[in-house]
Structure formats: C-alpha cells, structure tokens
C-alpha cells in the first residue's frame, strides 16, 4: 500500500506543478482547511486518494466514451456512487481537492516521502515569478455559478463513516474558500500533465492574456443569461405550485362550507318541524274549544232568559280573547310552514351550487401534471381562423404529459420510456406542422422557437434514457424541469401564433372529465368509434399494400406508412378516452392489453418509416417486414373489437348478478 501511495503522490505532484508555479501562495500547507481529511482513518484516506487519482487520470485521458469512473465490483456501492459523482466537479474544484489530498499525504506520511521529496522536480519549489500560463477559455454554456453549485452538491454526499471502511470517502466542502484564480483560470478541460518545457510555454503564452479576458467576459454574460432562464423556470414552478395549492384550498373550503350549511339547514328544519307539530296540537285543542264556545253562544241566543247573566258575559269575553289568541297562533303556524318551505328551497339551491361549482372546476381545467393548470377558457380564446397550432394536438400533449409525470412518481423507471414516447410522437406531429407553417409564411422567429422546442424534447428523452439505464440515479426534478420547459415553450407558441380548430371529437374530451360513466355506455361509444377508425385504416392500409406490390417509389411508400401511423395514433387516443373511466377494471385490463399490442406495432411502423429508402431491410432483426406489420396492425383492430365485445358481456353479466 505504501508504494501505491508514493506513486499516487508523485502523480499529484506532477499535476500540481504548474499551479504552484502560477501561484506560490498555494504551497502554504498550514493555511489550507484540512480538518475533515485529518479526521479520516488511514483506510478511508487511502480510498479517497485512489478515487481522486483515478478521476484525474480519466480527465487527462479525455475519452468521450468514459464520462465517469466505472463501478468496481469489490467496492462498496456508496463508494462507487461517490466515484461517479466526482465527474460533476469543476476543474478548479478538482484542483483544490487534489491540493488538499497532496498536503494531507505530506502530513501523514512525512517519513515515507523523503525519497519522494528528493525526486520532486526542482520547479515544484520555484517561486511564481513568471506570468501564469495560458488556459482554455470557459465556454458560455458552463456558468461559474452552476459549476460551484454542482461541486458542492457532489462533495456533500461523499462523507464516510468510521465504522464501515468500505463506504465512500469524505470530500471536504470548499464553499467558503476564497479563490485566487482569475476569471480566465477556469478551463473546460483538465490540463494535461506538464512536461519539462512547461515554464517556457508559460512565458510564450503570456502575450495572449488580454484576449482571454474578453472571452471570459463573454462566458460570464452567457452564464448570467442561463441563470436568468433558470430563475424564470423556478418562478414558473413556484407560480404553478401556488395555483395548485389555491385550487385545492378553494375546493376544500367549498366542500366544508356545503357540509356545514347542509348540517345547519337540517337542524333548523328538524327544530321547525317539532314546533310545527306542537303548534298543530295546540291548534286542534283551540279549535275544539272554539267550537264549544260557538255552541254555547248559540244556546244563549236561543234562550233569552240567560242573556242577562253576568257570569255568562264574563265567559263570552274570555272566549273572544281565546279566539283572537288562537287566530294569531294559527297565523304563526302558517308563517312557520312558509319558512320551512323557503329553507328547503335554499338548501336545494346550495346543493346545486356546490355540485355545479365542483363540476365546473373539474371540466374547465386541463391538468398539466401536479404543478399547474391551464383553463379551457384560455384555450378557447386562443382559437382563431389563422392559427398555426392544432388544438387537438395541443390538448393531447397536456393529457399525455399528465400521464408521463404521474408515471414518474408511480411506476418503475422501465415504464417511463413508453409514456415518454407518446409525448415524443405528439410533439413530432406538432413540430412537423409548425415547420411547414414557418417555411410557407417565412417566419424565422417561429423556426427558432420550434428549434428550442426540439432541443427541450431531446433533452427530456435523453434524461429519461439515462434514468432507465442507470436505475433512476438522475434526480426526478431534472426531468420535471425539462417537462416544464417544453410546456412553457409550447404555450408561448400557442399565445403568439394562435390555435386552429380542427373539429375535435367530443370523445377526446373524455380524459378531461372525472365524472363516473356507465361502463356499457363507454364500451358502446368506444366500439362505434373503433368501427369508424377500422374502416379508415383499411383504406389507408390497402393503399400501402398496393404501393409495395407495385414497386412504387420510397417516398410514396413512406407517405403511406405515415398515413397508417396517424390513423393508429388517433385510434389509440380516442378509443382509450372513454374506456379509462370504467368501473370494471378487470374488463378494462383485457382491452388495455390489446391497445398496448397496437401501440407496439405503431412503434415498429415508425421505425420502418425512419429508414427512408431501405424499407424492409433494417439492421434490427426484431422488426418484421413492412407487409407483416401492415397485416398485424389490421389484426389488432379486430382483436380490440373482440376484447370490447367480451368486456360488454362481462359487464352485463356482473350487472345481472348484482340485481
């Protein structure tokens, strides 16, 4: 182990030689913060020294195929993860780490390094009296702020534990260090190991220092633009989260208010009914007394001898007062009955208001993912006769993006690619139509926005591909940021150039409604729609087979394949819309498997379409010939129709058994 440490120490000494010549203050070992390295055990420090030397050698080799240190089976998984994260360090951050490790080796193994000290090149101890060497200019696409932030994030996750010697080594934090490098000292690549003529090269490159200052200023301006775009995306995400929170709080408040109002009205109605019952009982008693009094009055009128009785006069006055009192009670009872009727009407009105508000809140919003909403009212306002963007594709994108982001948080990484391909297919159709419009109308600004949309899409697909390969090591918020960039760019195009109404079927809106539907009705609608799409596909598929049999040109065959793909994609989108809300999930699963089979054939047709003139002669043996794909796709329509009929029978049998 001692010989390995000495060899790695010499390697670090050769790499740090130009840095010490450029700035002699870096050689002051006592001024460097190495407290975290001093707390490491010898085994942990030797692991850190090995990892830093391997990363330095990888950057010197500059192999584009090796973007990070490959994992070693004998190492702990945490250590392999830490070795991979070393590739995210900026060159200056790696240089500082190498210096700390270099001086820590001197401090720990001072006795064993006497031989190394005698063999150290003399220009390692030479003062920095000569001007600094010329370095490569920092590219505009790599801002300094982003480099430092990624370095801090990488170094913070590599702290080992003292008990587990196989864990990853600790890399100290350099967030509070004052860098003495000039703005031009940041280089995109790690400098190669210097030779014996390094100092002569330093003097020869001194004349180009002024030109590098101007290049550094350009890099700083580009970095500021990139930071401003990041801040814009962060503000959009924050605004979207606030909109979602306000929508949720509004729905909860409306629900709580409706429940409290219903409880209050129910209690009031119950109390009024009790009062009405008591008043009715009292009214019956009063009516009975009134009838007795009237009969007594009639008897007195018929018998004149009793008319001058003073007791009778007193009783008559009491009866008249009783009649007036009972009349007022009867009037009060009538008022109570009218009040009860009004309260019942008010309760029903509030119920309708709550139901309508909830329905409007669900139907008038298209959920992007979990962060923001796009009102349907704003989409309708963007529709114009001269619009460029297809409204159906615009809504389909947001629906598929919702499915994709939900899959990110629910499914495994292996299932992310299928939902991402749906988004890519929809965006490919959008980009094709927009490019055609930009060329016909000669709109360079639209072409630039379409290029940005393509770059964001490629970035999203690359991130998903890396996440699937590496087992979701990539943070999920990176994918969310790319998805948000695509949505913002697409909404900007829609606001600038408008939408065009292509007569979208009402069945496509089924994804936007969360109301429960009848399973038989949904299956009937899907069956009707599938029959229409099957006839349309039969016509386009027959044209494709005729073009293949007549040896037509590759462009003609490619156009026929593209027509088949469009019909299949529309079928997958429209047929699945009413079926996704079915209550019988077992019946829906059978249809879903048939739809997935059709989706697979659609992807194979797209792969065939991309080969251009080499139709039927692909390098991928897993893709069947074009004619077989055409017949298989036609068979999928029959399989889906048969699955829908089986689901109808299953649903009818279930409903009959529950009656």
From Swiss-Prot:
The keyword Signal does not apply. The keyword Cytoplasm does not apply. One of its GO terms (biological process) is establishment of cell polarity. The modification Phosphothreonine is found at residue 184. Keywords: Coiled coil, Phosphoprotein. The modification Phosphoserine is found at residues 129, 167-168, 182, 242, 513, 555. Residues 114-220 are annotated as: Disordered. Residues 116-128, 158-187, 194-220 have a biased composition (Polar residues). GO terms for molecular function: MAP-kinase scaffold activity. Residues 237-303 form a coiled coil. One of its GO terms (cellular component) is cell tip. It is found in: Barrier septum; Cell tip. This is Uncharacterized protein C3G9.05.
């Amino acid at each position: 182990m001692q010989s390995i440490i000495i060899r790695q120490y010499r390697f670090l000494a050769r790499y740090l030689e130009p840095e010490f010549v450029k700035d002699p203050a870096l050689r002051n070992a006592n001024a460097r913060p190495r407290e975290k390295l001093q707390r490491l055990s010898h085994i942990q420090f030797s692991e850190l020294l090995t990892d830093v030397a391997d990363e330095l050698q990888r950057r010197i080799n500059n192999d584009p195929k090796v973007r990070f240190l490959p994992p070693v089976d004998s190492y702990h998984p945490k250590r392999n993860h830490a070795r991979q994260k070393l590739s995210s360090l900026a060159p200056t951050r790696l240089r500082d780490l190498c210096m700390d490790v270099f001086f820590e080796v001197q401090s720990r193994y001072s006795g064993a390094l006497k031989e190394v000290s005698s063999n150290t090149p003399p220009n390692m101890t030479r003062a920095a009296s000569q001007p600094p060497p010329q370095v490569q200019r920092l590219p505009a696409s790599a801002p300094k702020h982003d480099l430092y932030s990624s370095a801090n994030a990488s170094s913070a996750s590599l702290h080992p534990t003292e008990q587990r010697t196989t864990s990853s080594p600790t890399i100290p934090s350099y967030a509070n260090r004052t860098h003495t490098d000039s703005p031009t000292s940041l280089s995109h690549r790690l400098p190669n190991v210097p030779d014996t003529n390094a100092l002569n090269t330093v003097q020869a490159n001194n004349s180009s220092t002024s030109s590098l200052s101007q290049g550094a200023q350009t890099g700083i301006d580009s970095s500021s633009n990139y930071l401003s775009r990041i801040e814009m995306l962060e503000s959009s995400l924050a605004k979207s989260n606030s909109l979602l929170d306000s929508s949720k709080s509004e729905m909860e408040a409306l629900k709580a208010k409706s429940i409290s109002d219903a409880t209050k009205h129910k209690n009031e109605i119950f109390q009024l009914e009790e009062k009405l019952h008591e008043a009715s009982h009292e009214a019956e008693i009063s009516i009975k007394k009134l009838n007795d009094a009237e009969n007594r009055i009639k008897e007195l009128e018929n018998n004149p001898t009793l008319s001058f009785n003073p007791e009778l006069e007193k009783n008559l006055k009491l009866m008249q007062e009783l009649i007036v009192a009972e009349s007022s009670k009867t009037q009060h009872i009538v008022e109570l009955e009218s009040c009860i009727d009004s309260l019942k009407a008010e309760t029903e009105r509030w119920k309708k208001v709550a139901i309508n508000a909830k329905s409007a809140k669900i139907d008038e919003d298209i959920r992007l993912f979990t962060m923001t909403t796009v009102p349907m009212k704003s989409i309708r306002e963007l529709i114009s006769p001269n619009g460029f963007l297809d409204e159906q594709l615009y809504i389909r994108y947001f629906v598929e993006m919702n499915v994709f982001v939900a899959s990110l948080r629910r499914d495994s990484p292996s299932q992310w690619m299928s939902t991402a391909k749906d988004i890519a297919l929809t965006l490919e159709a959008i980009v094709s139509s927009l490019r055609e419009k930009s060329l016909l109308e000669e709109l360079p600004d639209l072409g630039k926005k379409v290029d940005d949309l393509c770059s964001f899409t490629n970035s999203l697909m690359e991130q998903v591909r890396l996440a699937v390969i590496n087992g979701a090591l990539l943070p999920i918020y990176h994918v969310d940021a790319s998805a948000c960039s695509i949505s913002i760019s697409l909404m900007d195009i829609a606001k600038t150039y408008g939408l065009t109404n292509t007569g979208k079927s009402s069945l496509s809106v089924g994804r936007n409604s969360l109301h429960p539907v009848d399973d038989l009705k949904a299956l009937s609608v899907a069956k009707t729609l599938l029959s229409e799409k099957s006839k349309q596909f039969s016509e386009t598929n027959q044209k494709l087979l005729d073009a293949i049999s007549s040896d037509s040109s590759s462009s003609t065959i490619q156009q026929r394949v593209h027509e088949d793909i469009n019909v299949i994609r529309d079928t997958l989108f429209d047929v699945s819309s009413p079926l996704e809300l079915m209550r019988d999930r077992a019946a829906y699963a059978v249809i879903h498997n048939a739809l997935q089979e059709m989706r697979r054939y659609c992807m194979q047709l797209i792969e065939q379409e991309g080969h251009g003139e080499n139709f039927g002669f692909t390098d991928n043996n897993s893709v069947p010939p074009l004619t077989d794909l055409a017949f298989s796709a036609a068979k999928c329509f029959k399989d889906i129709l048969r699955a829908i009929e089986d689901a109808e029978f299953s649903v009818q049998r279930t409903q009959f058994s529950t009656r």
